[in-house]
Amino acid sequence: METTRSEALFKEAAKFIPGGVNSPVRACGSVGGSPLFIQKAEGSKIIDADGNVYIDYVGSWGPMILGHRHPDVVKALIEALASGTSFGAPTALETRLSQLVVEAVPSVEKVRMVNSGTEATMSAVRLARGYTGRDIIIKFDGGYHGHADTLLVAAGSGVATLNIPGSPGIPESVSAHTLSITYNDGEAVKRVMAEKGDRVAAIIVEPVAGNMGMVPPVKGFHETLRTLCTKHGALLIFDEVMTGFRVAKGSGQGLFGITPDLTCFGKIIGGGLPVGAYGGRREIMDQIAPAGPVYQAGTLSGNPLAMAAGIATLEALKKTGFYESLDAKTERLVTGLRTAAEKAGIDFTASHVGSMAGMFFTRATVTNFDEAKTSDLVNFSKFYTGMRDRGIYLAPSQFEALFVSAAHTNDEIDATIAAAADVMAGLV
């Protein structure tokens, strides 16, 4: 496809924006070439600056579960915009969105709105430390919980793509309070908790890892975390920024039957606008200012446009059979990709949890970050480029998930599988 306009825009952007992008993975550094500059989106499709149309499996990195420009969301935004863009004061929209979250996720009794997933996880960690009076946070290798200093340790997402273990600018005194353990290794967590459990404020984990590629939990892993946190008086934080309202109506915790103490949200609850939230048990959440001593604030928190888009989105998700339909579409995609790879004779594995999918160019079952890194990155890069050339838009990193939306049709999924078969046939 002709992408000269996107290439020119990228060069122009690099004059004014570090690396030409406002989030590192968008630069396409790990797959070569330059990023597409997007002009418009509709349903399951995006259109770049050169007018090329693509079936989109990035979905703005997860929020667009209904597809782009869903009419209910557009209507809600227009109505909210007519009243203003930001007030710096409470609105009824904040209460309604919070109510929808609380109704859908039983572990959440109160919720605080913020502006991003990073703000949500950062605030939840501060709250956990304030509530427990402890300092240590446990996370998992390849688990990306935003770019807050405390959590940018052995992270996935763009950090994995860049091969940076953390980031310059984070003092050792900060990272010293964060312990990172192999994901899905319950025995390793038991050993660490046996030694340091009385100093651990919280364990933070994604119900389904999404930034080392999509990696599901092994059986019993989350149950082990819940048991250990209860035993040692630590809080279990589920980072559901990606999985929240994506893998099931009740989010990851509802799907797996686990009750965390705190939960972080983002992406879908804002309907495509900047938003984040964290919530949990009443007695914990009431430690947040002004109800309690743990401080957190934000000029644009509870922004009325984001709240309106989020309300419209969560209301649409209540439709009977919504998640069953999404799951079936995603299963169709994943099965088709596996079949295409098998026919091509290449090393490949793919899986999904709800409408969140992942693939690796390896025959091994991937259960942690070290195993994810054994994927053939050269083949992934060739696959990404080949698919883009055929009108299929995937995340430009091996260490990201694919997202299917309600707007994707079976015909589009079949076209995606056919394109994949064509590309895979040419891979070594």
Curated annotation (Swiss-Prot):
Pfam families reported in the protein's UniProt record: Aminotran_3
Cytoplasm recorded as keyword: yes
GO molecular function list: glutamate-1-semialdehyde 2,1-aminomutase activity; pyridoxal phosphate binding; transaminase activity
Domain of life: Bacteria
CDD domains attached to this UniProt entry: OAT_like
EC number: 5.4.3.8
Record has Isomerase as a keyword: yes
Predominant localisation class: cytoplasm
Cell compartment(s), UniProt: Cytoplasm
Keywords: Cytoplasm, Isomerase, Porphyrin biosynthesis, Pyridoxal phosphate
Assembly information from the UniProt record: Homodimer.
Family the entry assigns: Belongs to the class-III pyridoxal-phosphate-dependent aminotransferase family. HemL subfamily.
Database matches in HAMAP family: HemL_aminotrans_3 (MF_00375)
Protein name: Glutamate-1-semialdehyde 2,1-aminomutase
Organism: Desulforapulum autotrophicum (strain ATCC 43914 / DSM 3382 / VKM B-1955 / HRM2) (Desulfobacterium autotrophicum)
